[in-house]
From Swiss-Prot:
Name this polypeptide is given: Urease accessory protein UreG
Spans through the membrane: none
Functional description taken from the UniProt entry: Facilitates the functional incorporation of the urease nickel metallocenter. This process requires GTP hydrolysis, probably effectuated by UreG.
Organism: Synechococcus sp. (strain CC9902)
GO molecular function annotations of the record: GTP binding; GTPase activity; nickel cation binding
Lineage: Bacteria, Bacillati, Cyanobacteriota, Cyanophyceae, Synechococcales
Keyword Nucleotide-binding carried by entry: yes
GO BP term, example: urea catabolic process
One term under GO cellular component: cytoplasm
Gene (UniProt): ureG
Keywords: Chaperone, Cytoplasm, GTP-binding, Nickel insertion, Nucleotide-binding
Keyword Flavoprotein assigned: no
HAMAP family on file: UreG (MF_01389)
Length: 201
């Protein structure tokens, strides 16, 4: 039986994807039946991190090794990820939510609609305040854009008001939020977004 929602989490290396998946699992594990699929190029490091963090039982976490091109495994040939999701859905038929974390990639990465229903795209302030205006599918078309590590703005000379202006211009009415996942700032907005997609749970 398919889960009620398959939610992709994508973004560049180091933007905070795994931190977001960890935080969502901690916040939602009491309310929802959850499972996670992570993607890494040559290891299962993110899956191992989540297992060590104890956010879900290990059998609810699957690590996929994508090889050299992480975006291919979530878009052009997502069969390895579809198989991992399918295994979880077969093992846990009551799943409400499967989180699929992509390997770190560039601003052009996007998920196949065959793999996920919706996508959260994570960028971070440390990459500079110009990132939102550079565009790309993650910036302009993701279902939720998360701009993480706002605490680093003064250290890297990033202007959050510039990021806000450019994000609103690039996304129109699509939702987005600032976060500092290290200390939970803005996480409630992401949790609320996820729960809105599951109104009958």
């Amino acid at each position: 039986m398919a889960s009620k929602l398959r939610l992709g989490v994508a973004g560049p290396v180091g933007s905070g994807k795994t931190a977001l998946v960890e935080a969502l699992c901690r916040e939602l594990c009491e309310r929802l039946e959850l499972a996670v699929v992570t993607n890494d190029i040559y290891t299962q490091e993110d899956a191992q991190f989540l297992t060590r963090a104890g956010v879900l039982p290990p059998e609810r976490i699957r690590g996929v090794e994508t090889g050299g091109c992480p975006h291919t495994a979530i878009r052009e040939d997502c069969s390895i990820n579809r198989a991992a999701v399918g295994d979880l859905e077969a093992q846990f038929p009551g799943l409400d939510l499967v989180l699929v974390e992509s390997g770190g990639d560039n601003l052009a990465a996007s998920f196949s609609p065959e793999l996920v229903d919706l996508c959260i795209y994570v960028i971070d302030v440390a990459a500079g305040d110009k990132i939102p205006r550079k565009g790309g599918p993650g910036i302009t078309r993701s279902d939720l854009l998360v701009i993480n590590k706002i605490d680093l703005a003064p250290l890297v000379g990033a202007d959050l008001s510039v990021m806000e202006h450019d994000t609103q211009r690039m996304r129109g009415d699509r939702p987005w939020c600032f976060t500092n996942l290290k200390n939970g700032v803005g996480l409630n907005q992401v949790v609320e977004f996820v729960l809105q997609q599951l109104p009958n749970v």
